[in-house]
């Protein structure tokens, strides 16, 4: 190990940051490193961090549906721009969180912002995280949901023949893996 490795700077004192961001960072940095926590404690840290900030959730309509495809039941949350009609193209959102953390409540604000900014509905896939799911269960659930949306999008008010895949962090990884699988299997 390199003895010259330096400690990361304390960004909580960065004069360029908004005071609310500094306060948020102080709270995050006050706890133990997330990798040292149990999965339950780590999930709670993320949940608490997201719920500690009041956010604008206006401009959207949410609905939930559990679909079954290829023998897998997968819960979906459909997030539409308020006042939208018909079956427009959509984007499928796959959340990050190191395969272990995250869910719709921790990503609700991000999905809302993407829906409002783009004007298109999102379909949030509530895949089973690790360690409850063993590889490749989460990817199988995501691909099953994408196949179902492609075939049945009108049932949830979207055009499943015109969808994009998106995700943050590990969700981006799984979006790419899903696109590659669709190409390999000549699927949606």
Task: Please describe what each predicted stretch is.
Residues 63, 123, 166:
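Conserved Rossmann-like nucleotide-binding pocket used by diverse enzymes
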Residues 80-83:
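Short, low-complexity Ser/Thr-rich regulatory SLiMs
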Residues 103-104, 110, 118, 123-162:
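Catalytic nucleophile-loop/oxyanion-hole region of alpha/beta-hydrolase
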Residues 95-97, 127, 131, 167, ...:
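Conserved phosphate-binding and hydrolysis motifs of nucleotide-dependent enzymes
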Residues 144-188:
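Primarily recognizes the serine-hydrolase "nucleophile elbow" in alpha/beta-hydrolase
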Residues 87-97:
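Short beta-strand element of the alpha/beta-hydrolase
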Residues 1-78:
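A glycine/proline-hinged amphipathic helix-loop "lid/cap" segment
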